[in-house]
């Protein structure tokens, strides 16, 4: 029987490499009763959404993921091209020039293959997400046939199936827009050539799935799968790999927030109110079940060291190694940090660095902002990294900073000497070159902006450590709530029976970081407060989870951010003193914006398989 079950798992809903993501043929040639009559067999079938991998791929290869974690932003970034999605925005540059074609508005064949090809170097996101959706649909349709499942097992399995289906559709909608939302396994006589829903409709359907998942998990007693803080089992056990009821409610709020956003909004303030109510529920629920923001001294544990904190509602941990034997981290960490000869890295632009306020809460994004901060005695453009938001040093590697792997008086050196050479930096007793002549290589991963990414780096060299993708965490819950409430009720508005105002929610995130409240001049009304909400989100969630890539699109701010000039920071030692000069990046590294760039196009050969499936516009 065991041998039979294994062979059935290999066929039932688990398409091979030749299976199209739109191939919904139900003729699988097996008897389903061999799977769904027992809880153990049904669970073994369903849990492939978490554990399934590509066959024939080398152990340790990130491309082995053929499960829901392929949708995890960090796994998507750990690709053969070594570009994170942040280099497709104004937030970052990359050492390897090839990744900049997307920023220039060219979604070429290479990147189409990256998203859709079932190849060792590909991320066939469409195929895998629709395979997962099919597994969820078959599980939901057959779960009542289990003869030996307890009510808790039955409800938890249904909850997970609804959650994973919603998460798969949410992922597809973020990158490609609205989808046909299939909730049943289609039969031979069913209509499977379905039209696309709008993005608004798709996000609302995702929210419905997340809401259903919450109700089932509540009934199953799986609102949290590990022990509460201070009790045995906290942050331990295999159960944390699976989403729980708190996560489902949080994702329901996020999906409704995306539906309400400017890119998708259909019903005005009522969409925002609906999102705010659920976001309020998520905050309350998270608190009841022991989730809270970590102290700022532990903030980085959300991203490295880990694998778990009580701030993470759901996270994916990946073992990275900062030496030349592991190129997977090179999408985030540039060559001086990981010694991978082709490491591209995510190198923050000066534009994004300017989003980090002074420690007094002064904005620095515009020349007028900086002049005002200088006049207040809060900013010095020749000592630009002093007196900044504490999260700046935890997010960005800049000249003159110390990292954990340095010793004594050792600091990171990015400046240039007057003779044109660059001093090395000592990290874990190794000499590393962070400063480098700009634009000298199209493949080397040295920064052209004067900055490197700190958030996912343990500050050491030649060490193994966990890099963590916090798919959703508590700080985001407050930011989601603040944004939704502000849009229908202003800074002093509330929702969901909470006394917490939109302004309070933002200030709570700032307080954890050691920052003062938002300055009063920015809290008069919805319109003046909105930019500070956006900025707080950009700072707190910087370079994680594709947040900025997604947020700048749903906010429709790309028309401004992707048409501005991008800058770096040049630092030269002159007469024993460092001189800081902003400079424009070369034209080849400047962004372009076209309306079609809100979504990626599907490959024509896939989209054409369905007559009613209208493709997105091509970028080229």
PLM features: residue spans?
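Membrane-proximal, proline-rich intrinsically disordered regions
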Residues: 19-76, 383-386, 607-620
